[in-house]
């Protein structure tokens, strides 16, 4: 919607046609143009179809935003292999399919462009009991870092967005073998003060400045700094918190404190 406020044309590629239609109507109300395209991001041919339809409709593409994804939790040894396949397909392979498709277009058109990959602070912080989600988001960050360098010579910018908890529909498909982990996730998202609109505004400002890491909240930035500056201390602190049961009792409070720092 932030793009719509700037009078951009927005293509909504979504597997849920009804949700795509609702989003398109909101885009139009904000002053932008919108089309909807049915898309399963796990299928490369669907991404090819999205590109063809957008180019046909608007004669080109300026920005690709890879925003599809799901969340999951679980102890490493208890996550079924099929759940690994599921989350990798949606969170990692979708990024690969989207980038492969649109990078080819950006190179052939020689028009420049921009790619925004939505990861998560989970890919940086590696909090416990979230290993499959952490791994896919770390992969998104690594892919983005590589593309930032590779695509510079063809004038294609890259940003990777790494929010912490914010108000989103991510819990709709959340999966875990343990109800306690589902309850914890609901608590974290339920206590989130940041809205999706704030994340979007922060992202657009970062695109305008060609900023690579888009860490949208203070708690995420503080965890990122701590891990970069003193990784051994970071893991000692996090391990101690986990051993003592701190996460279950006080993680929400910790995130609030970290939002006050920096």
Predicted regions and their residues:
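Canonical Rossmann dinucleotide-binding motif of NAD(H)/NADP(H)-dependent dehydrogenases/reductases
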Residues: 1-11
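Substrate-binding pocket helix/loop in short-chain dehydrogenase/reductase
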Residues: 75-76, 80-85
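Active-site helix of classical SDR
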Residues: 99, 136
């Amino acid at each position: 919607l932030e793009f719509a406020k700037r009078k951009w044309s927005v293509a909504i590629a979504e597997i849920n046609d009804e949700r795509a239609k609702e989003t398109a109507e909101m885009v139009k109300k904000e002053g932008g143009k919108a089309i909807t395209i049915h898309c399963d991001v796990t299928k490369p041919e669907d991404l090819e179809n999205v590109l063809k339809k957008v180019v046909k409709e608007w004669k080109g593409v300026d920005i690709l935003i890879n925003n599809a994804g799901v969340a999951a939790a679980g102890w490493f040894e208890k996550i079924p292999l099929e759940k690994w396949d599921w989350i990798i397909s949606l969170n990692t392979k979708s990024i690969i399919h989207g980038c492969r498709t649109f990078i080819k277009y950006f190179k052939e058109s020689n028009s420049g462009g921009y790619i925004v990959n939505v990861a998560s602070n989970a890919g940086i912080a590696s909090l416990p009991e979230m290993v499959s989600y952490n791994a896919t988001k770390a992969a998104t960050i690594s892919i983005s870092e590589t593309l930032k360098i590779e695509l510079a010579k063809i004038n294609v910018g890259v940003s990777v967005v790494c929010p912490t908890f914010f108000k989103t529909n991510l819990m709709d498909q959340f999966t875990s073998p343990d109800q306690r982990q589902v309850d914890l996730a609901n608590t974290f998202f339920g206590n989130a003060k940041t809205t999706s609109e704030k994340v979007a505004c922060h992202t657009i400002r970062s695109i305008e400045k060609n900023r690579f890491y888009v860490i949208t909240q203070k708690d995420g930035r503080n965890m990122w700094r701590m891990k970069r500056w003193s990784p051994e201390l970071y893991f000692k602190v996090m391990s101690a918190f986990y051993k003592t049961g701190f996460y279950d009792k006080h993680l929400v409070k910790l995130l609030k404190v970290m939002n006050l720092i920096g």
